[in-house]
Amino acid sequence: MNTQIPKHLEISTPGRICLFGEHQDYLGLPVIAMAISLRAKIDGKKRKDRKVVIHKQDLGVTEYFLLDDLTYSKPRDYFKSGINVCQMEGLTFSSGFECEITSEIPIRAGTSSSSAIMVSWIHFLSRMADEPVVWDQQKI
């Protein structure tokens, strides 16, 4: 289902805890997980150039890269990886983005802060692509 490209978009995703099966989901083993009330948020808009600017407010860090060079430059290069995955799914991006990321989810506390940010990022990209799509939760 195609939709119109928003000028500005805010996406929010909850963190989670594992009640049973921590670190087993990627092995295909059973997990009982539960969303928590703390959320990660991406607030962003399109740019007129091909630069991606990600302000990580909670960390006091800003990350920059060009859509023309999505080669991984560090371990866990999640934002480039997210764009690469979306491109493999057929999405295209002719312009970059300016985003601010904030999170209530504690880092390195077993509450899936990185996962929540990546789910928000993929959702944001799917809606801001040249031909936006509405993916269901399972697809994202």
What are these regions (language model features)?
Residues 1-115, 119-137:
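ATP-binding N-lobe of GHMP and related small-molecule kinases
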